[in-house]
């Protein structure tokens, strides 16, 4: 349920949803404003919370692996 709310709030943008789940939706809104105009990869690289940055990278790496291999 919570992930569905985040998906709606962030227009199904997976990196933003993952970052919001781990680091809080308000923080993601601030980061998206700060890094407006950058692509998703650059957004992820600029996440200032070390834990959230690592979390998003790990989940996206797994997501792409399974998407490409299964």
Located regions from the model:
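Catalytic and substrate-binding regions of cell-wall glycan-acting enzymes that process beta-1,4-linked
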Residues: 12-70
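Flexible, glycine-rich surface segments
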Residues: 1-14
């Amino acid at each position: 349920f919570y992930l569905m709310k985040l998906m709606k709030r962030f227009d199904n943008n997976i990196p933003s949803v993952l970052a919001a789940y781990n680091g809080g939706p308000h923080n993601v809104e601030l980061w998206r404003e700060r890094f407006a105009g950058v692509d998703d990869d650059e957004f992820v690289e600029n996440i200032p919370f070390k834990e959230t940055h690592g979390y998003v990278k790990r989940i996206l790496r797994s997501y792409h692996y399974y998407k490409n291999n299964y």
